[in-house]
């Protein structure tokens, strides 16, 4: 068998998420069907992260196996031909060892959350960034974010449906910058809990609005109680940037 690693970008707006589900459109389904159309092989695509409905990706990584060898550049062209009706595309493909696994071989995952912070909404970024009209205090958000760096119990920031066995995660990066009217939150970790990034962003926005003091983030973290954390930020502002191996 030949194992291929592909790097994918997609707009999550019209997808029910990455993972194949009965009765709804998923990124995994569209790609698996495209691969079948040119290879005549039923494959299972394994992704580095299972993005939720509405979440976008710039560098999602996945792998699949084929029984016959095909040039990687031909795979890129073939997949992109068959996924043309959808907001998804492959921009890299390479042959990898059969020991490689897109999910389990990953040592770090990187996300960015985009906020448009101005008095009027953005037409261009509709469904691609969270619009917040009230000014956000970036310095306060940065101070609050520092409490989340490192290894912690992130129970307060996981969804009620999270299936992870442990709430202990290690944030290796949480960087907040402002570029003109856009605020970008860069968040990295080896792995995440379900809704963890969006729940963190929702809480940091409360700090940015001066509803919370920065120190409240530490109180929320220590409480290990989802009910006292902030709201879940909208899915459409979140982007899976890359996985590292």
UniProtKB/Swiss-Prot annotation:
Location of the active site: 52 (nucleophile)
Q: Name one GO molecular function term.
A: RNA binding
Q: What is its EC number?
A: 5.4.99.12
Chain ranges passing through the membrane: none
Family matches, as Gene3D superfamilies:
Pseudouridine synthase I, catalytic domain, C-terminal subdomain (3.30.70.660), Pseudouridine synthase I, catalytic domain, N-terminal subdomain (3.30.70.580)
| Residues that coordinate or bind substrate | 111
- At the top level, the lineage of the source is Bacteria
Concerning InterPro entries, the annotation shows: PsdUridine_synth_cat_dom_sf, PsdUridine_synth_TruA, PsdUridine_synth_TruA_a/b_dom, PsdUridine_synth_TruA_C, TruA/RsuA/RluB/E/F_N
Question: Which reaction equation describes what this protein catalyses?
Answer: uridine(38/39/40) in tRNA = pseudouridine(38/39/40) in tRNA
Q: Name one GO biological process term.
A: tRNA pseudouridine synthesis
Keyword vocabulary terms for this entry: Isomerase, tRNA processing
Oligomer and partners? Homodimer.
Per its database record, what is this protein's job? Formation of pseudouridine at positions 38, 39 and 40 in the anticodon stem and loop of transfer RNAs.
HAMAP family, sorted: TruA
**Family designation:** Belongs to the tRNA pseudouridine synthase TruA family.
Name of the protein in its database record? tRNA pseudouridine synthase A
What is the protein's species of origin?
Rickettsia prowazekii (strain Madrid E)
